[in-house]
Regions:
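Conserved oxyanion/phosphate-binding beta-strand-loop segments in alpha/beta enzyme cores
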Residues: 2-13
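Intrinsically disordered, low-complexity segments enriched in glycine/proline and serine/threonine
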Residues: 7, 29-30, 57
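Alpha/beta enzyme core
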Residues: 12-17, 27-52, 66-76, 89-196
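Conserved phosphate/anionic-ligand binding catalytic regions in large, soluble enzymes, centered on
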Residues: 22-26
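Divalent metal-dependent hydrolysis catalytic cores, especially in the metallo-beta-lactamase
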Residues: 50-58, 82
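Short active-site-proximal "capping" loops at secondary-structure junctions
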Residues: 58-63, 86-89
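A glycine-rich helix N-cap at a beta->alpha junction
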Residues: 77-85
Length: 196
């Protein structure tokens, strides 16, 4: 199936390596690391040339906030440090506060659910109309000092012609978001270049 997508060896653009071990990877049972282990891992990832390290979810706990802040402060100019949040101002503010004194490029990676089940569980049905304007407002506020990465959580389970998803994508593009992710968040619905 991947052959339908083209020959990746002939790409002329640089491919950036994003390491989510410190955030997503530690969700696996038995994979949790200490404060010092997080900093050591981040330094090793930077030393081998990782371009972006997603360091954590600062709003989750004081420890997580301190880990992200220390990684951002210790990082060199060659690596970008990302912090994750939901599309909530207080969580994005926690990311900003953890990253602001960092040395290199800083990324706030925020997400919002777009599959019907995740929307229902997260904010309830019928409460999504204001979300595109919230995207514009929050991204406008934070994009002055940070790159913004936006993930549409559960995208593969949303309806492709869903006007809400289109409105969210439009709001993100109009807000000059650096990266837009369309993930298969919980698996089972992966598609690539026309696959099913």
């Amino acid at each position: 199936m991947l052959s339908k997508c083209g020959d990746f060896t002939k790409m002329k653009t640089k491919i950036s390596i994003l390491d989510t071990t410190l955030r997503d990877g530690q969700q696996s049972p038995g994979a949790a690391m200490s404060y010092d282990d997080n900093l050591t891992y981040a330094k090793m990832a930077e030393d081998i040339g990782v371009d972006i390290i997603e360091a954590g979810f600062p709003a989750a706990s004081k420890m997580e906030f301190n880990i992200v802040k220390a990684i951002a402060n210790n990082a060199g100019q060659s690596v970008a440090i990302a912090a994750l949040s939901q599309l909530k101002e207080a969580q994005m503010e926690a990311c900003a506060n953890a990253l602001i004194s960092g040395n290199g490029r800083k990324i706030i990676h925020t997400y919002f659910p777009v599959s019907p089940d995740l929307i229902k569980a997260s904010i309830g049905e019928g409460k999504i109309g204001h979300i595109p304007s919230l995207v514009r407002s929050l991204f406008g506020k934070f994009s002055k000092d940070f790159d913004i990465q936006f993930s549409l959580e559960g995208f593969s389970r949303s309806t492709i012609d869903n006007s809400f998803v289109v409105d969210l994508l439009r709001a993100a593009v109009e807000s000059d978001v650096e990266v837009i992710n369309l993930p298969d968040t919980i698996g089972g619905d992966v598609f690539c270049c026309g696959g099913s």
